[in-house]
Amino acid sequence: MHRYRSHTCAALRKSDVGSTVRLSGWVHRVRDHGGVLFIDLRDHYGMTQVVADPDSPAFKTAETVRGEWVIRVDGAVKARTDDTVNKNMPTGEVELYAREIEVLSAAKELPLPVFGEPDYPEDVRLKYRFLDLRRETLHKNIVRRTEIIAAMRRRMGDIGFTEYTTPILTASSPEGARDFLVPSRIHPGNFYALPQAPQQYKQLLMVAGFDRYFQIAPCFRDEDPRADRLPGEFYQLDLEMSFVEQEDVWDAMEPMIRAIFSDFAGGKPVTDKFPRIPYDTAIRKYGSDKPDLRNPIEMQEVTEHFAGSGFKVFANMIASNPKVEIWAIPAKTGGSRAFCDRMNAWAQSQGQPGLGYIFWRKEGEKLEGAGPLAKNIGEERTDAIRTQLGLEDGDACFFVAGEPAKFYKFAGEARTRAGEELNLVDRDRYELCWIVDFPFYEWNEEEKRVDFAHNPFSMPQGGLTALSSDDLLSIKAFQYDMVCNGFEIASGSIRNQSPELMVKAFENVGLSQADVEERFGGLYRAFQYGAPPHGGMAFGIDRIVMLLVGAKNLREISLFPMNQQAQDLLMGAPSQATPAQLRELSIRPIPQKKD
């Protein structure tokens, strides 16, 4: 028999009754029932109940074991009586009667419990992550993550993609977030950078004649902490294709990701045909370029109903500024003053002056609008709004006014708030869509200049002619995102493979041809030697796994994450380097001045 086990703790069944077996694992729980000890023995695969009665030679050792000790148990498999069968355990029809128990490793008193799902301080959980990972839900999440990544690899291979790995040590790139820099010992004063994404390398692969590339790529960004992103590193399914238009990328990736979601959704419905929503439409309907389509609320413009109306706040805004619009947020079943007042109070808590509203109720046989706005604009305008929005008795509508560029994010948050408060969001489904036709440029308010809205290597719609336009902010890009339940899970574009177009695109944001050659020299040179039309995208693996397992945050699907201060509490990183290490790297730290 093997030194440690003949079976795993999930393997034994009724067919094994009468067998002599050996198990090893962690003591999950010990119970004393009338002098008989019951030990739940756990390993990576599952759990088996071990019985040690007072007549067993193993009983003396069994009395000493405690939770999370690692033990080896030899014994006989016996069937449980009908009244003790545990149908919640795969091994619940049998138990192991211990003949010998060997303690392989004792455990100190635990700094946090691993039994159940306690709400424990995050820093304690991260410092003792090796214990935290023993918890059933977290352990299953990590296993499921591995299964999802394996399925991605398999399905990408099935549709003709090949995995290639790109360098981890590379050059610093000026676009995007801050780089993590790695000092060079051989070249004092020079630094490598950890890649924010394999963007330039995968495009170079297409220029090199490869096609249908993918990899499970680690990406590193030195960003300030955000609730929706882990500090330090994250993983993406990165891919690129040659001789394609954006429809080709969509046609390849939509079935693949739908299959991944269907395989791991646990029976929840998954969108069959992903709608393709232009960016401008998404902003106006949902107040976001990553809308949660499980929320049925769609905003509409109702400016005409307030122009010249008795509600002077809106009427005066419209008259004085042609950019002003009034957006309506219809709220089915929200027609109570209490709910409307709660929404108004929430808006004020967000720094807004309030949230105007109308709600409708029947007075006898007549459907009337109620609230201050209804009184000010009159019955005819109120009914016109109701008709436009398709509202009925018991429904409400909220209004946001101003220049859309300044208020659309708040309007989107109000839409989300209303949908959640009214339980309109179906949480037992996955709604996926494409967001397309992103703006190529945007206005940088801080620096008072035009800047790239997203990926600077995207192909602008209209090509070189569009880049010579007087209205740069009107240019759209062949860029697209995939969104699921309000989360961006992928982003991509058709790339610009023309050196002339590349130079012009960067000139429009204030960078010269010399700047382009200096910062993106490898890609710029490659494009001068025959570059195929190409495009691709990258899926955020962490977010996809989080959605599929129903985790509340990204730490619940990551093995050894950092905390929100970008510290690895388990390994003690970041840490100070020794003077000898710094001398080797020709680095002298400059002490920071204290305020």
Curated annotation (Swiss-Prot):
The record marks 33 as: Important for tRNA non-discrimination. It is found in: Cytoplasm. Its main location: cytoplasm. ATP binds at residues 221-223, 488, 540-543. It comes from Rhizobium meliloti (strain 1021) (Ensifer meliloti). This is Aspartate--tRNA(Asp/Asn) ligase. It catalyses: tRNA(Asx) + L-aspartate + ATP = L-aspartyl-tRNA(Asx) + AMP + diphosphate. Its EC number is 6.1.1.23.
